[in-house]
C-alpha cells in the first residue's frame, strides 16, 4: 500500500471486520455471577492486520487488535458521545491548544511508569517526518508540538485544529521501550492496555495474555474484574460463512457476520453498530463529464436513492443523513435533507442532453457482495436511461482504492460506488475533499468547491456545538453541488457466543467471558 493509500485508510473500514462504537443492543448479560474467571476469548477479523505498531498504521484491523494492548488518553462514551477519563483524568481545549492531565498510577505491562512525557514522545514521534507515520495529519496535526510538565501533557498548533481533543485523545499510545525500538512492536506490544501480545502467526492468529495491575480501564474495568479473560485470541477469518460456523461451534466468541449467514445465527445474542454501506463519489478531474456540477446533479437525479438504499442494505438499512456514519460521532446533523437533488428522471435526461456531448461514465464499484453488484447494475441502468454510457469496473475494497484514491491515472475513473468513507469527525474530510488533487495531494476526486473551502475555514476556529453547526454548513455545500453522495447506513451486527461486551468496540476492558 503506497503512502497516499495508507493515509486514506483512516477513512475506510472493512465492514466484515467492523468494530466501531455502537449501542448495547441485545448482547448484554446481567450480573457478575454469570461471568467466568480466567476464561478465554476468541474473536475474528477479516484480514491480516499487518504491522501492529499503532504509530505506523491506519489499518482498522490493526487498530482493533491494538485496543487490547494499548490505551488512549480519553474514552469516548458510546452512550453519551462525551469524553470520559482513561489515561487522562482531566483535559482542556481551545482551537489551538489541548491539555491532558494524566493519571499518576498508569503503568506499562512490564510495570514501568507511563508519564505525560511518554505521551508527548509518542506524538512528537508521529510528527517527525522522518518516521513517515500515516497518523500524521489524519490524527495528529503536522504542526503539533507536544510537551510535558509533571503529569500534564500540552499539545499546541500554529493554526486552529477542530476536535483536536478527540483526535489526539483517540491515538493508541506506546511505552518508552517500544518508542526506542519501534520495529519490536510490529509483531509484539509495549503498552498500558490490559493485554500483552505473546504470539503472532501471520495470516492466522494473534494471542494475548492478561497483565496484572490494570486498574484504570473504561467503565471501571480492572485486571481482576469478573469476566475479564486470561487469554485473548484474534483469529483471521475472511469468510463470513466460516465466521458463522466458528461462532456456532463455539470456536469463536465474537464476530461480525452479515448477509444470508445471519439467518443461522438468530439464536445468538448480538450488538448492532452502524456503518456507511453506500456512497457515490464523483471524480471532478478536468475533462471528465463529472467535473461539471450540472452533470453530477443530473446523475444524482436519475437515481432513486431510497431504492438504491434497499438494494445496498438488503432492506436492513436506512438512508444516510450526512457523511458522518460512525457512532458515536463528534456531531449529529442532517445535511442531506433538502440539499441533494431530488429524484427526477425526466429532468436528469434533459440535463444530460443539454451537455451537448457524450457523457461516458466508468463506475468503479464493490463486487465482493451480491448487494454491491446489484446496486451498481441498478445505478448503471438509471444513468443509461438518462442518456449516459456506463462502463462497470468491479473489484474488492483494495481494488477500489487502487482505481480511485491510489490511481496512477487520476482521470481513469468517473464515479465510485463502494468507496465508503467512515468517520465520526467532520474535520478529517478537508484533506481528502479539498486542496491539491492527486497525485500531488490527497484530494483523490479533484474536488474544488470554493463554498466548502470558505465554510471549512470558518469552522476551523470553533469548538463544541458551535463547531458542529459550522461543519454542517460546510457539508451542505458538498451536497448542493452533488460532489459526493452519502447513500445508506447499515446496522452491522457483532454476534456473541459465550461472551458479551459492555459496549462496542470490543477491545480490552469491554469484553466479558461468560461461564
Locations of regions flagged by a protein language model:
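Structural transition elements
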Residues: 318-354, 369-372
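Surface-exposed binding/hinge segments that line
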Residues: 97-99, 135-179, 194, 198-201
Amino acid at each position: 500500500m503506497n503512502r497516499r493509500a495508507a493515509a486514506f485508510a483512516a477513512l475506510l473500514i472493512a465492514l466484515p471486520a467492523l468494530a466501531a462504537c455502537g449501542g448495547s443492543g441485545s448482547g448484554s448479560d446481567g450480573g457478575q455471577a454469570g461471568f467466568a474467571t480466567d476464561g478465554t476469548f476468541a474473536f475474528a477479523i477479516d484480514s491480516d492486520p499487518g504491522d501492529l505498531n499503532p504509530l505506523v498504521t491506519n489499518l482498522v484491523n490493526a487498530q482493533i487488535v491494538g485496543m487490547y494492548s494499548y490505551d488512549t488518553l480519553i474514552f469516548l462514551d458510546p452512550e453519551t458521545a462525551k469524553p470520559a477519563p482513561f489515561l487522562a483524568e482531566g483535559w482542556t481545549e481551545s482551537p489551538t491548544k489541548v491539555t491532558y492531565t494524566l493519571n499518576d498510577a498508569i503503568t506499562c505491562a512490564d510495570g514501568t511508569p507511563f508519564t505525560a512525557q511518554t505521551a508527548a514522545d509518542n506524538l512528537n514521534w508521529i510528527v517527525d517526518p522522518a518516521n513517515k507515520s500515516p497518523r500524521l495529519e489524519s490524527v495528529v496535526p503536522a504542526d503539533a508540538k507536544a510537551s510535558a510538565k509533571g503529569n500534564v501533557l500540552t499539545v499546541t498548533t500554529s493554526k486552529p485544529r477542530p476536535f483536536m481533543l478527540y483526535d489526539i485523545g483517540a491515538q493508541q499510545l506506546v511505552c518508552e521501550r517500544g518508542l526506542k525500538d519501534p520495529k519490536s512492536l510490529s509483531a509484539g506490544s509495549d503498552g498500558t492496555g490490559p493485554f500483552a501480545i505473546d504470539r503472532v502467526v501471520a495470516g492466522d492468529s494473534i494471542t494475548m495474555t492478561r497483565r496484572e495491575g490494570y486498574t484504570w480501564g473504561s467503565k471501571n474495568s480492572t485486571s481482576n474484574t469478573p469476566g475479564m479473560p486470561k487469554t485473548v485470541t484474534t483469529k483471521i477469518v475472511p469468510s463470513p460463512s466460516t465466521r458463522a460456523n466458528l461462532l456456532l461451534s463455539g470456536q469463536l466468541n465474537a464476530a461480525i457476520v452479515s448477509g444470508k449467514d445471519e439467518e443461522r445465527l438468530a439464536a445468538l445474542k448480538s450488538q448492532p453498530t452502524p456503518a456507511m454501506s453506500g456512497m457515490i463519489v464523483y471524480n471532478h478531474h478536468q475533462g471528465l463529464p463529472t467535473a461539471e456540477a450540472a452533470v453530477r446533479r443530473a446523475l444524482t437525479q436519475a437515481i432513486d436513492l431510497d431504492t438504491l438504499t434497499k438494494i445496498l442494505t438488503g432492506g436492513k438499512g436506512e438512508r444516510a443523513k450526512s457523511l458522518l456514519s460512525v457512532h458515536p460521532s463528534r456531531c449529529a446533523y442532517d445535511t442531506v435533507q433538502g440539499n441533494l437533488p431530488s429524484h427526477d428522471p425526466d429532468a436528469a435526461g434533459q440535463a444530460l442532453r443539454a451537455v451537448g456531448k457524450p457523457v461516458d461514465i466508468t463506475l468503479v464499484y464493490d463486487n465482493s457482495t451480491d448487494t454491491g453488484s446489484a446496486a451498481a447494475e441498478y445505478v448503471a441502468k438509471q444513468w443509461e436511461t438518462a442518456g449516459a454510457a456506463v462502463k462497470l469496473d468491479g473489484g474488492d475494497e483494495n481494488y477500489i482504492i487502487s482505481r480511485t484514491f491510489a490511481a496512477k491515472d487520476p482521470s481513469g475513473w468517473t464515479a465510485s460506488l463502494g468507496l465508503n468513507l467512515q468517520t465520526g469527525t467532520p474535520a478529517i474530510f478537508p484533506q481528502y475533499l479539498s486542496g491539491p488533487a492527486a497525485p500531488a495531494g490527497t484530494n483523490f476526486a479533484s474536488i474544488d468547491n470554493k463554498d466548502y473551502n470558505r465554510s471549512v475555514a470558518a469552522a476551523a476556529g470553533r469548538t463544541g456545538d458551535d463547531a458542529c453547526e459550522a461543519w454542517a454548513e460546510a457539508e451542505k455545500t458538498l451536497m448542493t453541488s452533488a460532489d459526493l453522495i452519502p447513500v445508506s447506513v447499515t446496522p452491522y451486527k457483532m454476534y456473541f457466543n459465550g461472551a458479551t461486551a459492555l459496549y462496542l468496540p470490543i477491545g480490552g476492558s469491554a469484553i466479558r467471558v461468560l461461564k
